[in-house]
Amino acid sequence: MNEVPTTPVRLILGQAQQREQNSENCSQERNPRTFNSEPDSSFNSPGSSQFVIHPHEPLEKEKDEKQDLDRSIDYGRSSALNNKNNANPLENIDINKMFDDKKSDSGTNDDKGGASTSDKHVLALNYSPIRVEMNSSEKRSDKNVDVDENDKEGSHINKKLKLQLESVPDLKQSSTKDIINDKEEIMSSPMAIDMIETNISPNKFIINDGVERNDSFNINTDTLKLENDINEKQQEEDFIKSNSNNVVNIDNAYKEKEDEENDITNSHINRLTPLYETSARESNSNEEGRNDYDDDNQLDIRHDNFQIVAKRNEELTDQIYHLNQMLNSLISKNESLSFQYEKLNKNHQLLIDLTNEKLDKLNTERESDIAKVEKFKKRIKELNTEIKVLNSNQKILQEKFDASITEVNHIKGEHENTVNTLQQNEKILNDKNVELENMKAELKGNNDKLSEYETTLNDLNSRIVQLNDKIESTDIVLKSKENELDNLKLSLKETLSISKDFNDSDLIGQINELISTKNNLQQKMDDLNNLNDDNLKVVQDKLIKNEETLKLKEAEIDSLNSEMDELKKQITSKDDEFKMWQSKYETVEDEAKIRNAEVTELNGDIEDLKESKLHLEETITELENKVHKLENECELEKQKFEKTSLELESLQLKNSNIQAEHIKELENLHENLISLQNELKISSDRITTLTKENEVLMEQNNNNNNSVTLSNDQKDRDDEKIKSLGKQVQDWKEKYEAKEKDTNKRLKLLAEDLYIQYSSKHEQKVKLLKKGYENKYQNKFDQLNLENKTLSEEIEQLNKQLSSEREEKQELLKLLENEKK
């Protein structure tokens, strides 16, 4: 693939028809026994023409034709054919004829021996990707001198290869001037494409490009035919040399040779230079003229074959250029499709990533919303249980409060009874005071009336006993009231333990004050009881001692008066205590009313909580509906995503199919190029073999015809031309490698430009998609955020209420614990 073999030939347009006719006429004049081997010795292989041999003119005409000798051997000397070919040489070429192996031979010429190029054999050649020129240094040096002669006899065309990727060459040649101007154009060689390795690629096909190469060319058979032809030719030459003395045998041998040449020339398909023929019919008298004629005939044949090879080379270079152009277009299409596929793939992956991210976000938000809803449900359940507990506690507190009110009313009635009893006692005490005063008067007036005093003392004793009984009854009543107070205290503690949520600190303080006053009263009652006991003892002592002394009685009366004063003080203190109890009772009633108002407020709060519960349930249902809507939207988005993924898969399949087709086409083109290169190698090998054979034959001809000097000059020229062609081949190889490097650089730059364009377009698409999705879901997210904020605020309010209630309960529990201590 790196080195492309070339077939160096000279592009010739035109046939040397006139010189061929002149040479034939001259040979007929010099040798009356001329033969018609020239018109009949044509190559019958299709798609080729005969090599035109430039005849060597006689000595008397050499001076007139020296200007022709200075020119190159590939110069066309037929003006008629040059004019025909200069019009448009490519239009005169028929590819089907060139590759048709079954085409019959062209017809023979007239008896005079004039042969046209249409009657001559065509040489079939393999494809050559490069159009080259066998340049003549003499022709270039004499270019300005021979312009007029070229206009007369046919212009010499130097057409080189020009394979450019940018444009298709204009192969039509309008005039001889354009052909002359295009001589020095150097065209670039076709490029090798390094994208696909034929050894690695699994798909290898052969494109049927309209030419069946396997049918038209068989390399192995051609080589075998060439070897057989060379051997037969050598045998014939040996046979002719051995029989050169017999003239009759010469004529027969030459006729046999002519027939055999007509049969052999079919195998001379791929030879660029024919074998030199020696004539056995020459006699000793015309041997020199015969050799000159054979040399000229061979030169004409070579000239025609060079011309045909050049034409075929030109056609093949054009075909290879078109194939390279098609291959480059297919490569560019394939690259564009691959870039489009990469773009679609990247867009598809980005869409998948975006949708996955959005789905993940929606799923996380959905999970967070579900967790929040579950928390709200749990909170609502807790609030419901707390509300139920509060309702039950409220009922219990209400019942206990009613019971405590009834107990307070009962205590109030008992207190009124005690007040009445105290008033009666006061009245009794007043009466006693009056009686004591009377007794003092009686004692002072009548000391003799002891018996009366005794009776009065007895009465007093009886009264004291009654008073003691009354005091005992009052003590019993007080004890019962104390028990009732204890019961009330226990009931109050129970109420306080039950009503932990209420703020009863003032009530508890009042109760504590009542308890302290009660304890004081109990102490005082104990003191009174003790005093009563002492008084009883004293009275008994006095009763015992009254008999003895009146003084002691007076002292006792004084003590009784003092005791009466103390009792009055106690009564006044009890009145004060009663007033205090009455004021406390009023405060307790006020507090009870306040508690009732608080209970009503709590009932209102409970109703508000129930309403908030209903509102929360409604919001939960709305959130659940929104969650269902979001799930439905997610399902729709998933369906859309699946549709887009299916579409992308179909596009990927189409792209892969198209890419496979393009790869197949590229592989076919690569294989065609490889086949062309192989054919070029084979043709170059053939050229080398033929050149070697030519050298061998030229040596033989030089040994047989030492008198001919032009053949040696021609050989030297051929050697020089071969060397120049070798240099040109190396130049073409270097140009081919440079062109290949340039195309690779261009392809890399084009790929980078396409990648930059694709990346910019992709970023714009991603930005547009982001904006679209943000605008689509922004309103929904805002609504959900507002709802979440409202719900969080409501929950905070409920938490604050619960925390305040719990603090109140804890304070009540602390107070109860302090009271128990």
Swiss-Prot record:
Pfam family, one: Fungal_TACC
Effect of R77E: No cleavage by ESP1
Modification Phosphoserine occurs at: S188, S189, S201, S216, S283
UniProt source species: Saccharomyces cerevisiae (strain ATCC 204508 / S288c) (Baker's yeast)
Phosphothreonine carried by residues: T7, T273
Lineage top rank: taxon: Eukaryota
Compartments (UniProt record): Chromosome, Centromere; Chromosome, Centromere, Kinetochore; Cytoplasm, Cytoskeleton, Microtubule organizing center, Spindle pole body
GO cellular component terms given for this protein: cytoplasm; kinetochore; microtubule; spindle; spindle midzone; spindle pole body
Encoding gene per record: SLK19
Region Disordered, residue ranges: 1-52, 99-153, 274-298, 699-720
Post-translational modification: Cleaved by ESP1 at the onset of anaphase. Phosphorylated by CDC5/Polo-like kinase at the onset of anaphase. Phosphorylation takes places at proximity to cleavage sites and is required for an efficient cleavage by ESP1. Phosphorylated also by CDC28.
Coiled coil region boundaries: 310-821
Record field: compositional bias (Basic and acidic residues): 99-122, 136-153
Alphabetized InterPro entries for the sequence: TACC_fungi
Site (Cleavage): R77, S78
Protein name, UniProt field: Kinetochore protein SLK19
Biased composition regions of type Polar residues, renumbered to the chain: 15-51
Other observations noted: Present with 314 molecules/cell in log phase SD medium.
Principal place of residence: nucleus
Annotated function: Has a role in spindle assembly and stability. Required to ensure a timely exit form mitosis. Essential to maintain pre-anaphase spindle polarity. Associates to the plus ends of the microtubules at the kinetochore and spindle midzone. A component of the FEAR (CDC14 Early Anaphase Release) network which promotes CDC14 release from the nucleolus during early anaphase. Required for proper chromosome segregation during meiosis I where it prevents premature sister chromatid separation.
GO biological process, one term: centromere clustering
Reported impact of S78R: Destabilizes; not detectable in anaphase cells; spindle becomes thin and fragile
Keywords noted in UniProt: Cell cycle, Cell division, Centromere, Chromosome, Chromosome partition, Coiled coil, Cytoplasm, Cytoskeleton, Kinetochore, Meiosis, Microtubule, Mitosis, Phosphoprotein
